[in-house]
Amino acid sequence: MSIQIFNTLKREKEPFKPLKDGEVKMYVCGPTVYNYIHIGNARPIIVFDTVRRYFTYRGYDVKFVSNFTDVDDKLIRAANELKLTVPEVADRFIGAYFDDVDQLNVAKATVNPRVTENMDEIIQLISTLIEKGYAYESAGDVYFRTKKFKDYGKLSGQELSELQHGARVEYNERKQDELDFTLWKAAKPGEIFWESPFGNGRPGWHIECSALAKKYLGDTIDIHAGGQDLVFPHHEDEIAQSEAATGKTFAKYWMHNAFLNIDGEKMSKSLGNFITLHDVLKDNDPNVIRFFMLSVHYRKPITLNDAILEDAKNGLERLMIAYQNIDHRIQTDDGEYVEETHEDEWLEQLTELKQAFEDDMDDDFNTANAITTFHELAKRANIYLSKETVSINVLREFLSMMRLFAEVLGLKLENTQTDSLDDSEVEALIEERLQARNERNFARADEIRDILKEKDIILEDTAQGTRFRRG
């Protein structure tokens, strides 16, 4: 089965066919760096990092570009409030961005272009649109003639006659038509600006991504992605600008993730539930946050609350414990493993699980189903570990496959927080030890006791059951 992508432009799943065999050119809209990103921003970051990882796993050479908007009204306001320059604000929060997403195990982009470092390309694209009659100057501003682009609305499915722009596009008397949107803003007194043929000023939001995608990926790209809130007007405007300028298709596939809600409500400052990723990471394992984000298909809304995060923590721990148990069994190999008579059957099961995982990811990157398959792998690993005799070959294959699944999903199976086990991990091992003893697999029961002893955890078998204390 080939990779299937739900293409927002076509409103259906389509088989992925790259523009060039073996290569994927992918652009994801990045943050406006005037503050810490909110937890909702982390969803597209994690989702499309995972999409990229899977393409890499399938053998594609992925060129991944994600920008920083480092000048706009919000940055100017933040600079005034913090008594800093706009570049100083941008530098501060770009650094904070990398600090946060590095914890989430997000791979580095091929390029993270900053708007302010690519102003020549932005100005050139605006000039091209003016030359072709798709844009016009008005009192130092430059606007795009929306109605001249006949395909406008094709991404969002809206008709020109019914369109109403969102908050980022304001009506003013300088426009020839209320649907026209800004490409270049004339400088106001005291604001940062760049020189251009249209006068001193700075770019509008939408033109930035068109120019950066063109510079780093070319006139046509394979995949353009972002949150569903960007479909209109941002991505709709990008299509209009880019295709008007080049006469070519801007992006072949458009991918959009659904919203993250806080306790069932959309996150917003007015509701008082606006949470930054930076704050969430202070109290939560980033590995758990990543697992949580991938536990629901990216096109479905996801809800964040303490109970759901606890479920994610427990789900991830089950995978980690299975992995660590297998690894420990291999590391403590004393040469007493025997050739287990059903080795071929177990290896065949592993092959089937690998195929199931690939089928899940091929189906529009269904990480929720992929995690279910991952848990089935861990379950079978635990069953195998409880056997009296095992094959080192099967153990190594279990370990290799768990690493493979984790790498695609960007999860870490080692204990990343501390070398010690928390109470739930200890209790899971105690339960596994009890099962081993009931099955008269005393070698495995003793092995679990040794694992816990290495972590300074002492077991005490009592009439009421097994208790533990930390040494």
UniProtKB/Swiss-Prot annotation:
The gene is cysS. The lineage of its organism: Bacteria, Bacillati, Bacillota, Bacilli, Bacillales. It comes from Listeria innocua serovar 6a (strain ATCC BAA-680 / CLIP 11262). GO terms for biological process: cysteinyl-tRNA aminoacylation. SUPFAM superfamilies: Anticodon-binding domain of a subclass of class I aminoacyl-tRNA synthetases (SSF47323), Nucleotidylyl transferase (SSF52374). Monomer. This is Cysteine--tRNA ligase. InterPro entries: Cys-tRNA-ligase, Cys-tRNA-synt_Ia_DALR, Cys-tRNA/MSH_ligase, Rossmann-like_a/b/a_fold, tRNA-synt_1_cat_dom, tRNAsynth_Ia_anticodon-bd. It catalyses: tRNA(Cys) + L-cysteine + ATP = L-cysteinyl-tRNA(Cys) + AMP + diphosphate. Zn(2+) binds at C29, C209, H234, E238. It holds the Pfam family DALR_2. It comes from the Bacteria. A motif ('HIGH' region) lies at residues 31-41. One of its GO terms (cellular component) is cytosol. SMART domains: DALR_2. NCBIfam families: cysS (TIGR00435). A motif ('KMSKS' region) lies at residues 266-270. Its cofactor is Zn(2+). ATP binds at K269.
